[in-house]
UniProtKB/Swiss-Prot annotation:
Top-level taxon in the UniProt lineage: Bacteria
Binding site for NAD(+): 11-16, 37, 101-103, 125-128
GO cellular component: cytosol
Protein name: 4-hydroxy-tetrahydrodipicolinate reductase
Length: 272
């Protein structure tokens, strides 16, 4: 029987950190080996189970990245761009798999992270769910099939605590639409309309971000032409879909060669 994979969780006090702990607890394939939080956090040094309001579980919350990863096969990371860069460097030092769900990164930050893939396995995705990654592929195919008479808009909705916009998933969808049309997203992206903007530019890919309440995540890709519209839609009602996807990515990466991968690789959806 395969030994359960030892997983470290970063940002363990946050929404996704807690969901990952709960999801690990329901799986026989993985086990929680380390719980990490930022230096100075109230949970540092406390038993994770007690910090979560339950019983002791024998895992102390730590801010010592190297020690935590030395006893882990993989680290799952839904934190901030700056923290993710540090985790990528630490994971590469010890050869741990790094599964990244952090969003809001610049191209320079992504390059810093991907540079660590020379000696480590990195799986990075703006969204870990099966449904969203299928939506990405569908978006690319529909965009390729339709001409510029169809305007493309990506509309995303999230809870009122989300700090980046557009969401990482929205950008994935925008990239897919641009790739389908054979253009660069940077050249056609329209992320802000206010005041007298003038008519919509033909070929642009627009983004709309909604923030409110406790919305987990909703994404629509609208293809609108004269007399007809097509909408591709995904709704996440529970963060467990992201946690399950992240664990699937870690298990998939267990015996992979060093390199930078994404969820399309994990799910076998990559073209070619």
């Amino acid at each position: 029987m395969t030994t359960p994979m030892k997983i470290a969780i970063t940002g363990v006090s946050g929404r996704m950190g807690r969901m990952l702990v709960d999801t690990i607890d329901t799986s026989d394939a993985v086990t929680l080996s380390a719980a990490l939080e930022r230096p100075g956090h109230d949970w540092i040094g406390r038993d994770l189970g007690l910090a979560l309001g339950g019983t002791e579980r024998g895992v102390l919350v730590s801010d010592d990245i190297d020690s935590a990863l030395a006893d882990s096969e993989a680290v799952i990371d839904f934190t901030s761009p700056a923290a993710t860069i540090r985790f990528a460097q630490a994971a590469a030092r010890v050869g741990a798999i790094h599964v990244i769900g952090t969003t809001g990164m610049t191209e320079q930050e992504i390059a810093q992270i991907d540079a660590q893939a020379a000696g480590a396995v990195i799986v990075r995705a703006g969204n870990m769910s099966l449904g969203v990654n299928l939506l990405v592929q569908l978006t690319k195919r529909v965009a390729a099939a339709l001409d510029e008479d169809f305007d493309i808009e990506v509309i995303e909705s999230h809870h009122n605590q989300k700090v980046d916009a557009p969401s990482g998933t929205a950008l994935m969808l925008g990239e897919a639409a641009a790739e389908g049309r054979g253009v660069s997203l940077d050249a056609v992206s329209d992320r802000g309309r206010d005041g007298l903007t003038g008519a919509r530019q033909k070929g642009d890919i627009g983004f709309v971000s909604v923030r409110g309440g406790d919305i987990v995540g909703e994404h629509d890709v609208l293809f609108a032409a004269q007399g007809e519209r097509i909408t591709l839609r995904h709704v996440a009602s529970d963060r467990s879909v992201f946690a399950r996807g992240a664990l699937k990515a870690a298990l998939w990466a267990r015996h992979r060669a060093p390199g930078a991968y994404d969820m399309l690789d994990v799910l076998g959806l990559k073209d070619g």
